[in-house]
Amino acid sequence: MEIKVNFLDNLRLEAKFDDFTVTADQPIRYKGDGSAPSPFDYFLASSALCAAYFVKVY
């Protein structure tokens, strides 16, 4: 899988892979705009989703 990351305005980031686009931002307290989940929020959510998948399948 190829992932392309684009730097948007302020601290916003965009990752494109397959047919998906994911936008990330930092919270206002970290000088972001709070317009999207932070990269770390996505990391935690993806870990929980992986665990949930394996619980459901096995």
Where do the model's predicted regions map?
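Extended beta-strand/beta-hairpin segments
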Residues: M1-A45, V55-Y58
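Alpha-helical metal-binding/catalytic segments enriched in His/Glu/Asp
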Residues: C50-A51
